UniProtKB/Swiss-Prot annotation:
PANTHER family: 3-ISOPROPYLMALATE DEHYDRATASE SMALL SUBUNIT, 3-ISOPROPYLMALATE DEHYDRATASE SMALL SUBUNIT 2-RELATED-RELATED. It comes from the Bacteria. GO terms for cellular component: 3-isopropylmalate dehydratase complex. It is an enzyme of class 4 (lyase). This is 3-isopropylmalate dehydratase small subunit. NCBIfam families: leuD, PRK01641.1. The keyword Coiled coil does not apply. The keyword Lyase applies. Belongs to the LeuD family. LeuD type 1 subfamily. Pathway: Amino-acid biosynthesis; L-leucine biosynthesis; L-leucine from 3-methyl-2-oxobutanoate: step 2/4.
């Protein structure tokens, strides 16, 4: 997973609350078996409207989504995070996230920055008054900056560490290789053991 320290990109003001995962990516797109190529599925229903924010310049090239409260509710869909990332988003700012979406985001390297509602309102105004304004998400200092607005955001320490170091679940597990080896070495012989990975050929 790619490390995340800070990112600056065009902010996209999405004035919508309770955006669920079916709105982020409709269920019809979940039949695909790959983990990439979902950019066309992101907000597919809403993008039928030519006036939808992502259909207008300069927001179509945005990389920081600024949404309303309760973003990512509904069913657990890693596809929702994949679609956001495939489109080009590196971070989502919201006053509150669904727990499952926040967890899926952390595992895929998408920063879910929880910012107070009043600060989100101020960021929206900056982006709407000056389209093309950039937003900086600084994971080191846990702050977001947009025009004259600088605001702190909440993110738990473990998620922050994993994002900063680029650690997915497998990488975290491999970080305990010595302990795993010691545990396996002490297991009684009659119990199942982990076999070495097979190689082709």
């Amino acid at each position: 997973m790619e490390k995340f320290t800070t990112h600056t990109g065009v902010g996209v003001p999405l004035r919508a609350s309770n955006v669920d995962t079916d709105q982020i990516i409709p269920a019809v797109y979940l039949k695909r078996i790959s983990r990439t190529g979902f950019e066309d599925a992101l907000f597919a229903g809403w993008r039928q409207d030519p006036d939808f924010i992502l259909n207008t310049e300069p927001f179509s090239g945005g990389t920081v989504l600024v949404a309303g409260s309760d973003f990512g509710t509904g069913s657990s869909r890693e596809h929702a995070v994949w679609a956001l990332k495939d489109y080009g988003f590196r971070a989502v700012i919201s006053p509150r996230f669904a727990d499952i979406f926040r967890g899926n985001s952390a595992k895929q390297g998408l920063v879910a920055a929880q910012v107070e509602q009043e600060d989100v309102e101020r960021i929206w105004k900056e982006l709407e008054n000056r389209p093309g304004t950039t937003v900086t998400v600084d994971l080191v200092t846990r702050t977001v900056e947009c025009g004259d607005v600088t605001a702190p955001f909440q993110i738990d320490d473990d998620t922050r560490r994993r994002l900063l170091e680029g650690l997915d679940d497998i990488a975290v597990t491999l970080g305990h290789q010595a302990e795993i080896d010691a545990y396996e070495a002490d297991r009684p012989a009659y119990k199942p053991t982990t076999l070495p990975a097979r190689t082709a050929g």
